[in-house]
């Protein structure tokens, strides 16, 4: 009596039995079949007759075959198994259920907003795309089968395979090094996590200065943030100081009430004031 693994084509074991001509065999395949089932097999056909009678042919053996195959179990997020637990309860040291990542994966996006020292200046942005599939687990070997009958390919939850572009938030008094994080398209289950950092630097100021000893104390003017672009500032209003004329770094006269757009929003700009010539009466 041969026990054959139809999945691999190999013979698992062979039992030899004998008896006198015309006698009934007491041999049964049920015990072996039950044991194989405990190890993840399922019965295909039992070719051994229930009431075998030994024949009278001494030259030719009576051969019978029991066919078994590996039991296959579909696994997916809606019908999961406990990862690491024995597939066959009666075989604690045997094959184990696979990790959930074999059929359930999430790709994450994280965007952090920090200053030059790493201090958080705005709420972190997070997003994720989930992918699931159905795999088939071989109950005999623990092999994870990802194609063929009973399996389903990776699909994105809700059909979403994109991280949308993320506009950097405006942080008062600072400018960002990136206006936005670009969109990431065509994500799949094997895509790497996306980790981005946007760094903010404090904006500069207009700094009034004069060599005139009578020049009054004039406060600096911090560059205003551009409300529509975290990387930019808008022109800063030049302080009007009665009796003095303002000049930009290139020496150009700045008219009272005018504004100045700095070339580098993170650098201070010195506005030089010269005393107006007093006219006699």
Enumerate the predicted regions with their spans.
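Extracellular modular ligand-binding repeats in secreted and cell-surface proteins
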Residues: 1-281
């Amino acid at each position: 009596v041969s026990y054959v693994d139809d999945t691999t084509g190999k013979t698992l074991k062979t039992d030899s039995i004998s008896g006198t001509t015309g006698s009934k065999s007491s041999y049964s395949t049920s015990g072996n079949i039950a044991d194989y089932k405990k190890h993840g097999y399922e019965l295909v056909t039992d070719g051994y007759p229930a009431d075998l009678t030994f024949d009278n042919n001494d030259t030719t053996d009576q051969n019978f075959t029991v066919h078994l195959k590996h039991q296959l179990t579909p696994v997916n997020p809606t019908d999961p198994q406990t990862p690491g637990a024995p597939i066959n309860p009666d075989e604690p040291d045997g094959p184990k259920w696979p990790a959930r990542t074999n059929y359930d994966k999430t790709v994450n996006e994280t965007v952090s907003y920090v200053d030059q020292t790493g201090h958080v200046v705005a709420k972190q942005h997070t997003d994720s795309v989930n992918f699931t599939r159905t795999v088939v687990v071989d109950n005999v070997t623990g092999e994870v089968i990802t194609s063929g009958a009973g399996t389903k390919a990776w699909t994105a939850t809700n059909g979403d395979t994109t991280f949308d572009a993320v506009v950097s938030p405006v942080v008062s008094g600072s400018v960002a090094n990136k206006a936005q994080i670009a969109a990431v398209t065509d994500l799949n289950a094997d895509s790497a996590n996306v980790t981005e950092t946007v760094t903010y630097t404090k904006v500069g100021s207009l700094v009034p200065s004069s060599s005139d000893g009578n020049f009054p104390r004039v406060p600096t003017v911090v560059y205003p943030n551009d409300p529509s672009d975290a990387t930019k500032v808008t022109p800063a209003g030049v302080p009007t100081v009665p009796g003095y004329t303002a000049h930009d770094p290139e020496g150009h006269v700045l008219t009272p009430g005018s504004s100045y757009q700095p070339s580098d929003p993170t650098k201070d700009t010195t506005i030089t004031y010269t005393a107006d010539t007093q006219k006699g009466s």
